Amino acid sequence: MAGSDVDSEGPARRGGAARRPGAPGGPGSEAAAGCPEPLSTAEAPAESATLPAWMRLYFYGMHGITLDVLVSSARRFARSPDLRMLGFSSPYRCLLHSLTHFALEKVYLQQRRCPNAFVFNFLLYPSAHVGLQTLAGQALLLSLGGGAGVAVAPGALDLALQYVLALYHCQVFLKRFLRLRYGRQRRRQQQQQQQQQQQQRRGALPVPPGARVPTAAGARRRRPRGPRGAGGAPSQGLPDLPRFLFFGMHGFLDEIFFTFFFNVLGQGDGTTSGHTSLWSFFMYGSCSFVVEKLYFHLHYSRGWGTWKRVPIYVIFIYVWELSWGLGLRTCGACSWDYSHYPLNFMGLITLMYLPGWIFLSVYQDLISNVLWRVQYVPAN
């Protein structure tokens, strides 16, 4: 969504956002038990593997932007209460979050080698986290400011906040995130099983494993996606709550990137950050969650193609944006205003961003296809 009157912390006006793809003891044995890597053969699904590096980097950047927005919004609200709950971050910080958290992941995985879990969890890892985040933040300030006098040493409150975030990463986030597994070979094996079943129904010989079966002329090919649940949706993958959290964080990512590039390219005011609102988390998280359900139903149950589904997505998105805008505007919490754009309705929706919604609707389907192959393996 667009923030219309952002103060000096962010751009003065925002034209709207193509948002939404539409997201962690004791010594010895206790330290080893608390480390999720690697899973034993009994714990890990036979067809799953650790999340690929690119996927972890993607999520670390998105998660880092979410923390930036939460912290900056809380600080801004404490100074000047504003129900729009604006928060700030930037693509630069997204890249830094991806790299620093990827490095801290490697530090976290050394937990088993530390003889004392308490020392690692409350001293060693937090020290590495605070030091790396401080260095990255100072490097970003120097590179953007262009002068040696720009960087300022962090205060005691900043260091305390970084320590709390380090405990969150070690005791909560990484402890659960690193138990996610990605099913790489599931699609091919399920496709072979379906082909074998089809051949057996026709009275033909079973297909040898790994062999391809030619599709009959004129036959309609449906991409197998595994066992189906209610409404034709895949019955495997992440539960609903983690999916909602992922979509909400991705809404932050989309808004930060869009507002940053909109202000750099459109206004040229030299801004170094983008902005969003805390309400966007719930708005885009719920919107993407429902659109994903539409995708599963229209694609798997009805067999609709992409360009037949996209108009349904876009209509729903506009209705959702208008409904949230009306609700937030009544209590002075609406962070966007499209009144200065043509083809707008009540300043809450505009056809100017139709191409962006179409692109993100297609991207949403791609994300859903990836997410259903991600599984959470709980600790024994």
Swiss-Prot record:
**Chain positions covered by the region annotation Disordered:** 1-40, 188-236
**Which organism does this record belong to?**
Homo sapiens
Q: Which residues cross the membrane?
A: 51-71, 117-137, 244-264, 278-298, 310-330, 343-363
The signal peptide stretch is none
Keyword Transcription regulation found: no
Q: Predominant location of this chain?
A: membrane
Q: Which UniProt keywords apply?
A: Membrane, Transmembrane, Transmembrane helix
Q: This protein is called what?
A: Transmembrane protein 229A
Q: Which GO cellular component terms, listed alphabetically, does the Swiss-Prot or TrEMBL entry include? A: membrane
Please state which protein family the record places this protein in. Answer: Belongs to the TMEM229 family.
Residue spans with biased composition (Low complexity)? 190-202
Task: Point out the gene that encodes the protein.
Answer: TMEM229A
Give the subcellular location.
Answer: Membrane
Keyword Membrane assigned: yes
Q: How does it sit in the membrane?
A: Multi-pass membrane protein
Q: List the disulfide bonds.
A: none
